[in-house]
Amino acid sequence: MIPLPTEDPQILFQDDDLIVLFKPSRMYVHPPEDCIARKTVGRHTCIHWLYDTHKILANPIHRLDFSTEGLLLFGKNNPTNSLLNIQMRQHRIQKYYDAVVRGWFKESFGEITLPLESKKSDELLECRTLYSTISKIELPLSVNSKFPTSRYSLLDIELKTGRWHQIRRHMNRVAHPILGDREHGDSHHNRNFRDQLGIDGLCLKAKRLEFYHPHTDQKMVFHAPVSPMWEKIQNLFEPKQT
């Protein structure tokens, strides 16, 4: 059974040409390809929500995974869609993420360039993920008798290419999987975050979106609101006063 979202999306901006939407976790952008999943999800997608709630027909310019919350850009007409898609190809649409990962990186910032397989074949695709450490913590959470504590990092991530599960797969490949990732993560640490800290969900958020308005060339910058889960995460990583 696919869990449905516990909250609705939010329209953060719209005009005659485009929409910036905040997508909650556990919501598809559009109907999934899998027939069984499509029946279960029904009209619980961002595209259907825009039409059912606001009578808006819009086209997503990019995507977010089902489990990832954050900012999405939609075009409302064909000329706008074409211009925004050009910006995507020219890398003028910039997407920034927050992620909680297992462990501490040796360097405070870096770039991951490991090629990743295509979603539908074994073809290796060029991938670029930039990261920098925002904060590090060590918690009294043990996943085995060898280590009484566990280390975690809060990362700022810029996505330079947009492959399937790119951030999630890149972090897993460098041995720093994202917390709450059931497909590419560490089940022991996921369980501790859920049971001990009450953080149950993928700790990945599309937090900032930058692009140029396709008809005025004005730079547009948007920040995602803080959801209840991310409020817990922020509190966890805030420096404790002594």
Where are these regions (language model features)?
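Pseudouridine synthase
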Residues: R43-C46, F147-L209, W230
